[in-house]
Amino acid sequence: MRKIQSVFTGKLNEKIASDCVTAIDDGTIPGAWGSENIDDEGNPQVKRVLIKNGVLQSYMIDRLNARRMHMESTGSGRRQSYKFEPTSRMSNTYIAPGKDSFEDLFAGNSKKGLYAKK
């Protein structure tokens, strides 16, 4: 966000997606690939809502960028390996299940889309 490398820069609390979109980054899911007790900067992992009902709620921010942006770290500081400094990275990011029926999802004018289920 700091270098305006994201389309979401400066859009906190703004509507950026459909009302039915809630996106979560959760580093606390037991046994999941991106889960750890702490990030690579020592911050505890949390379940973080990034987008709620289409509104941008939070960024994924490491400690250095949090300081530069005058925000708090979100526990997203991860290293690619010991050779690299921590940077903002996802843990387990997913779109939360919606409440609409299958029929309601496709009742509009959408010509293309992706439907996923467990």
Language-model segments: which ranges?
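N-terminal small-residue-enriched
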Residues: 1-118
